[in-house]
């Protein structure tokens, strides 16, 4: 139907409004107000605030039953005027667009009324009508009637629900929606749809660019009128009973706050209550649409089985650790990396052991009942092998006699008798015969007449493990526990570790004499070694922790004897020697254990552990009872502990710790290459790294000692260096007669420090400025104290500790006096310091510089000393006699061109001596060390001058004393005399 209207001003305005969907105003142009979801948020324009006739209206649609009309009423106006717009659209072939910005509301069809054209509006009404928002569409579910999903369209606060079929995807297809709506009309559902996707009961929402078909819409309206459904009758009756009211503001629950263009949201849910399958949940405009979907067949379990299990066990709640998956694991879970690394390490150890001690390895295998090619499979078997190795060493080794005597007599019968009764049928008879040959005293416990103990032998775990391996077990709670490790089955008849006697021996010796980690390996030492009287062996495998435990008790006892109220450690050079020797001794011992691959190189430094034990002596004190006898005196123990704690915090102990640290730092000084630091592996290496000088020449070492003394002003640094040097010399003496591989290793790990100090003192210059450092660094004064300290500390690694029962005497902390080192008992006063002069005479111990081809001397940093340098780089005109030690404080001697023909005289030398700040030497002594052979002057002889450039370190560096003494020499080099060469 075409709209008949004259193209006048008002008619043209209406036509443009219907076609374009926008409000066209003539004069004056007024901007159209913007629509907002909330009308209270819409700002008013300037014109609307000034003009009282501006209205703000919204559409309200009431659906009436048949024979009724749908009315449209506006909201209350903002001004004084009221306007009510009513439009009845029935069968109009032109439908206005309901887009944002239009001034007309969407048409609503009227049931039971013949179609008639919509009334035209006046120009004023069209200008005052604000644009309305497009109807919103959402999806909802009618759970009450059990119908399918539906489409919900909303306009002006009224909702129209249209059933839609379940879609295959997330969003429904329009074709399926249209076909479903048409089928509902044919079945008498009372609801019809148009091709544009809208319904006849709700506002028309035509598709863009497609005009609606009014003829089909009328036919569907008539069919719905003729065949109403019960649902439509019920809704119609409800609408008749409700009077028409104005549209209320939309609430958040109705989805009015959602913007028109918001996309529907989709999620997945499971209806566990009704037992249905999983579903797809679509949400649009605040409503949810649930579409059933089939259960998945992927990696996830079937939800129906899980739901049925939960429904069947509702009465009994499931525990938290219930798992739904289990599998049979006959062999368990094996961590092959651990077993592989264990086998590789043990195989290397066994190779070395088999090469050095093949008979001992064979005895161990017989002891354990293993075949010749068997290797331990787990850590327990490795420990069994080590215990068996220690047992054979304790029974038939060189330490068998010592171990037998170290075990308390009341425990010997239990250990040796039980061992014989347990293994006399498993070990060959030759084993027990060898044990009796090494230690005849043990034969009394190897008596065949004694009946074997009726102790039932514990069966091996082979049967139990095999049964457990065949039974499949579910892997439950695999996320919270580590992987199960399947230990290989032990060999048949393997002796358990509890039956091996070595742990019992170790425990018995530790109770009586302190901790014992390994079986001793007694190595003979030379007669010049500073050991106790009658002792000639050292246990080279003694653990560092055992040595630290014993030395701690020794130092506490010595400080306790010398502790006074006002005494100072620096006043007793014997105690200073003891403390400085302790740090070097324990570090050197740790280096030796690491060289034998008995300890890990990454362990903490030994001197640091010793300091920590001494500072916290109260925490490391003995137990309140005697482990050997079981007797206890708690009151005495509490008193002793308080005294030891007080001694550990005393000033004397703090001073001792200072010197322990100084010598320990020297022993562990790493080598700094500039880019990396390499730790020292021996006491010899630590001393060389501290001096930063190779020990290829004693002259260089002597110079480095003096340089080190100048660099460090405090005496403890120099005391630590000298203490490490002297202790290293005593170690070298002990292992100089190398009879074993361990002795050879220890010999090369040390240096004869006493010889180095003597060579340094050959210049008749003391080392350092302090009286204490001069006394400690002089072997002629302090050698006796360092020898006593070494003798005291060596008792911890010799048989003297067990024979003299030192552990019981030191741990009891009684008032009984113990004289362990006679040379350390009396207080040794420190002699006064000697003046540490630095001569500036060029004719005494001078530095020798390298002479370039051009005759220039090199920089003072490139110093060459006399010992060991080739004659081609030595100054040939200068003959230096006596010990020469290069020193930065010495004068420089180099040949230059002559400046005068005046011969050298004693006055020049005396003038040079007077320029020095030290006591000058006589003139005749000034030239005593400088031998120059005068010769007759020749015609074309070169003239040389001997310059003495003296700069005293105690004076200003800019002040120089320069004396020239020309000498007559030939152009040929003066040959050195035989007598002078012999003196060099």
Swiss-Prot record:
Gene Ontology CC terms, in alphabetical order: membrane; symbiont-containing vacuole membrane
Biased composition (Polar residues): 66-85, 92-105, 135-156, 242-285, 967-984
Sequence repeats mapped onto the chain: 129-172, 258-301
Keywords annotated in UniProt: Glycoprotein, Membrane, Repeat, Secreted, Signal
Biased composition (Low complexity): 902-914
Cystine pairings recorded for this chain: none
Subcellular location: Secreted; Parasitophorous vacuole membrane
Signal peptide bounds: 1-26
Compositionally biased residues, Basic residues: 214-228, 892-901
Residues glycosylated per entry: 81, 390, 780, 925
Superkingdom of the source species: Eukaryota
The protein, known as: Rhoptry neck protein 4
């Amino acid at each position: 139907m075409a709209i008949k209207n004259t193209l006048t001003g008002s008619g043209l305005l209406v036509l443009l409004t219907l076609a374009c969907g926008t409000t066209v105003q003539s004069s004056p142009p007024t901007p159209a107000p913007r629509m907002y979801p909330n009308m209270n948020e819409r700002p008013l324009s300037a014109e609307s605030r000034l003009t009282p006739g501006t209205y703000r209206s919204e559409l309200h649609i009431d659906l009436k039953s048949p024979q009724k009309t749908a009315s449209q009423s506006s909201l209350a106006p903002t001004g004084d005027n009221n306007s009510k717009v009513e439009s009845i659209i029935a069968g109009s072939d032109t439908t206005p667009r309901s887009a944002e910005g239009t001034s007309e509301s969407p048409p609503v069809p009227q049931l039971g009324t013949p179609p008639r054209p919509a009334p035209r509006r006046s120009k004023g009404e069209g200008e005052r009508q604000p644009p309305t928002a497009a109807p919103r569409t959402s999806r909802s579910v009618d759970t009450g009637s059990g119908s399918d999903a539906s489409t919900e369209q909303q306009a002006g606060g009224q909702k129209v629900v249209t059933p839609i079929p379940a879609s295959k995807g997330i969003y429904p297809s329009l074709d399926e929606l249209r076909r479903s709506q048409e089928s509902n009309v044919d079945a008498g559902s009372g609801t019809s749809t148009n091709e544009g996707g809208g319904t006849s009961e709700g506002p028309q929402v035509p598709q863009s660019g497609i005009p609606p078909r009014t003829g089909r819409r009328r036919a569907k309206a008539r069919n719905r009128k003729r065949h109403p459904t019960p649902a439509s009758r019920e809704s119609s009756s409800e609408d008749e009973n409700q009077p028409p009211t104005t549209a209320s503001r939309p609430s958040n629950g109705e989805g009015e706050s959602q913007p028109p263009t918001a996309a529907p949201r989709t999620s997945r849910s499971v209806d566990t209550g009704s037992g249905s399958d999983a579903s797809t949940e679509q949400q649009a405009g605040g409503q949810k649409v649930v579409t059933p979907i089939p259960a998945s067949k992927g990696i996830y379990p079937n939800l129906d089985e899980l739901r049925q299990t939960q429904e069947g066990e509702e009465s009994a709640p499931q525990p938290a650790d219930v798992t739904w998956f289990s599998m049979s694991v006959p062999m368990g879970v094996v961590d092959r990396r651990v077993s592989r690394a264990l086998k590789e390490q043990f195989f290397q150890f066994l190779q070395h052991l088999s090469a050095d001690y093949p008979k001992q390895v064979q005895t161990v295998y017989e002891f354990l009942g293993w075949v010749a090619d068997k290797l331990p499979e787990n850590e327990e078997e490795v420990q069994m092998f080590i215990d068996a190795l220690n047992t054979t060493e304790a029974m038939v080794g060189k330490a068998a006699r010592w171990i037998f005597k170290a075990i308390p007599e009341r425990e010997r019968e239990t250990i040796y008798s039980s061992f014989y009764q347990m293994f006399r049928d498993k070990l060959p008879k030759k084993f027990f015969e060898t044990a009796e040959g090494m230690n005849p005293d043990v034969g009394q416990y190897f008596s065949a007449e004694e009946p074997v103990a009726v102790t039932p032998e514990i069966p091996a775990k082979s049967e139990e493990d095999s049964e457990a391996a065949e039974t499949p077990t579910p892997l439950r709670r695999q996320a919270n526990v580590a992987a199960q490790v399947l230990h290989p089955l032990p060999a048949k008849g393997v002796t358990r570790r509890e039956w091996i006697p070595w742990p019992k021996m170790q425990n018995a010796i530790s109770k009586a004499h302190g901790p014992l980690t390994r079986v001793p390996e007694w190595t003979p030492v030379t007669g010049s070694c500073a050991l106790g009287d009658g002792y000639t062996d050292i246990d080279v495998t003694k653990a560092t922790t055992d040595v630290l435990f014993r030395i701690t008790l020794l130092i506490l006892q010595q400080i306790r004897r010398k502790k006074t109220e006002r005494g100072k450690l620096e006043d007793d050079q014997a105690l200073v020697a003891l403390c400085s020797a302790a740090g070097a001794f324990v570090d050197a011992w740790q280096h030796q254990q690491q060289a034998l691959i008995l300890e890990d190189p990454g362990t903490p430094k030994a001197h640091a552990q010793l300091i920590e034990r001494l500072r916290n002596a109260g925490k490391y004190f003995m137990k309140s009872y005697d482990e050997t006898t079981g007797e206890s005196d708690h009151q005495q123990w509490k008193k002793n502990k308080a005294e030891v704690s007080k001694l550990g915090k005393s000033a004397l102990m703090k001073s001792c710790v200072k010197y322990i640290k100084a010598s320990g730092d020297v022993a562990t000084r790493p080598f700094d290459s500039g880019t990396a630091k390499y730790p020292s592996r021996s006491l010899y290496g630590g001393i060389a790294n501290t001096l930063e000088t190779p020990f290829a020449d004693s002259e260089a070492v002597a110079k480095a000692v003096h340089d080190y003394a100048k660099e460090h002003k405090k005496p403890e640094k120099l005391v630590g260096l000298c203490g490490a040097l002297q202790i290293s010399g005593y170690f070298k003496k002990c292992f100089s007669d190398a009879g074993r591989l361990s002795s050879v290793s220890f010999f090369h790990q040390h240096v004869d420090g006493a010889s180095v100090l003597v060579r340094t003192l050959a210049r008749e210059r003391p080392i350092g400025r302090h009286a204490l450092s001069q006394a400690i660094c002089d072997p002629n004064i302090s050698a006796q104290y360092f020898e006593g300290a070494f003798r005291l500390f060596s008792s911890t690694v010799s048989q003297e500790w067990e024979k003299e029962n030192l552990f019981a005497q030191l741990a009891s902390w009684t008032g009984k006096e113990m004289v362990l080192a006679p040379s350390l008992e009396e207080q040794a006063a420190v002699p006064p310091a000697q003046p540490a002069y630095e001569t500036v005479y060029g004719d005494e111990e001078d530095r020798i510089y390298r002479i370039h081809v051009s005759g220039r001397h090199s920089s003072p940093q490139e110093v060459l000393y006399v010992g060991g340098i080739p004659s081609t780089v030595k100054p040939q005109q200068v003959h230096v006699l006596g010990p020469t030690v290069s020193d930065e404080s010495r004068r420089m001697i180099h040949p230059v061109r002559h400046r005068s023909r005046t011969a050298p005289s004693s006055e020049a030398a005396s003038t040079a001596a007077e320029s020095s700040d030290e006591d000058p030497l006589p003139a005749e002594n000034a030239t005593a060390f400088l031998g120059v052979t005068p010769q007759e002057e020749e015609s074309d002889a070169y003239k040389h001058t001997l310059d003495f450039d003296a700069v005293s370190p105690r004076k200003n560096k800019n002040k120089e004393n320069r004396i020239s003494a020309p000498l007559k020499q030939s152009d040929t080099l003066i040959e050195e005399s035989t007598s002078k060469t012999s003196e060099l």
